[in-house]
Amino acid sequence: MTHSLRVIFAGTPEFAAAALAAIHEAGFPVPLVLTQPDRPAGRGMKLQASAVKRYAFERGMAVAQPPSLRRAGKYPAEAVAALDLLHATPHDVMVVAAYGLLLPQEVLELPRHGCINIHASLLPRWRGAAPIHRAIEAGDAETGVTLMQMDAGLDTGAMLHEARVAIAPDDTTATLHDKLAAAGARLIVDALVELERTGALAATPQPADGVTYAEKIGKHEAALDWRKPAAALARQVRAFDPFPGGAGTLDGATLKLWAADAVPGRDDAAPGTIVDIGPDGVVIACGEGALRVTQLQKPGGKRLPAREFLAGAPLAVGQRFAPADAA
């Protein structure tokens, strides 16, 4: 089936690529794709195209990669060229998903149906850069995807559609990301079909109550504070997979802790102390309960199940991970 609604798409990572693929496969014309410039990545730090760029190039879509869209910003010449291109490209709506660049008011007002953002949370909870991580870290039972009519604020626009997704006890950011990407892809196609059919989408202002912000994840957050309850640390480990991982310092070496669950602990063990080692994992005392770590990684090594890790890097009961503030 083909559609007449013309969609400019702006997005960068895999989450966005899933939406672009769904829009394209549904038959909506995509006259232009915006994505961030290629970035160095990997061990060789070679320039890598974004997931959105790779998908668009493989299908012959026009792609622009401006470093900014702000006329008065750091890259005024590039911004002007990109804005001229947007003005010259006939379109009806812009869909934005994890693009990573601020859209000035000029861009927000350009499409006749405005700009629709695909946000990976149930707004107004978890506005901001890391909604998937923060939902898991906080112990939320569910999250979802919200389609929002973009305005000048940070994820403050009116809500158009939402889809709810349960957070499973073993979900990591990686697994939940994939669920939400699929939900967002379905949701945006349904919304575009409705927009084309009716000419407008019903918009509901976000409530003033329940607003929370999902701050960007920093590498420093990887360090586990063993004084916290084990349940909170287990959520932290899941929230920070694949980035930045959980981390603990043992005898001066920083180990990455990739999978863990909370188990009963011992009252006589100081937080951070290894209290048990077995084929099922390494059990570490916490402020409340204990954390059983089932997947570890030593510096320069690979992520390994506990059994394989211990075969090459034995640990001992009584060893103690350094406090987070001393690591």
UniProtKB/Swiss-Prot annotation:
Q: Which GO terms describe its cellular component?
A: cytosol
EC main group: transferase
Q: Which residues bind (6S)-5,6,7,8-tetrahydrofolate?
A: S121, L122, L123, P124
CDD domains this protein is in?
FMT_core_Met-tRNA-FMT_N, Met_tRNA_FMT_C
Question: What InterPro entries has UniProt attached to this entry?
Answer: Fmt, Formyl_trans_C, Formyl_trans_C_sf, Formyl_transf_N, Formyl_transf_N_sf, Formyl_transferase-like_C_sf, GART_AS, Met-tRNA-FMT_C
- A Pfam family matched by this chain, by name? Formyl_trans_C
User: What does this chain do?
Assistant: Attaches a formyl group to the free amino group of methionyl-tRNA(fMet). The formyl group appears to play a dual role in the initiator identity of N-formylmethionyl-tRNA by promoting its recognition by IF2 and preventing the misappropriation of this tRNA by the elongation apparatus.
Q: Which HAMAP family match?
A: Formyl_trans
Q: What is this protein called?
A: Methionyl-tRNA formyltransferase
What is the native source organism of this protein? Burkholderia mallei (strain ATCC 23344)
